């Protein structure tokens, strides 16, 4: 059995197959729009409005996803956004 165990040790299995990268505890599809709102609030000196918009955008994306993965949100954008806007992103 030790020979089989040594063969299995060279493979690394993730905890889940859909384990996505997170920054500051948030997946990128939720972090980027919120960071854009906060950045806009900082550049226009409307700090509270930027933070409030970021919170609303964050919860809006969470409600839209409803426990589904980031790929579902990407596919939704692919099917419902105009082709001219997404030509360079989805090729």
Curated annotation (Swiss-Prot):
Single GO cellular component term: cell outer membrane
A biological process from GO: pilus assembly
Classification via InterPro entries: Pilus_assmbly_TraL (IPR016382), T4SS_TraL (IPR009838)
Keywords: Cell outer membrane, Conjugation, Membrane, Plasmid
Top-level taxon of the source organism: Bacteria
Organism: Escherichia coli (strain K12)
Major localization class: membrane
Protein name (database record): Protein TraL
Function description: Membrane protein involved in F pilin formation.
């Amino acid at each position: 059995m030790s020979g089989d165990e040594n063969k299995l040790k060279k493979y690394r299995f993730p905890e889940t197959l859909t384990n996505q990268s997170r920054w500051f505890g948030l997946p990128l599809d939720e972090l980027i729009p919120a960071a854009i709102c906060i950045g806009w609030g900082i550049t226009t000196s409307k700090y509270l409005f930027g933070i409030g918009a970021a919170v609303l955008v964050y919860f809006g994306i969470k409600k839209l996803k409803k426990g589904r993965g980031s790929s579902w949100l990407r596919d939704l954008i692919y099917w419902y956004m105009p082709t001219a806007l997404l030509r360079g992103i989805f090729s």
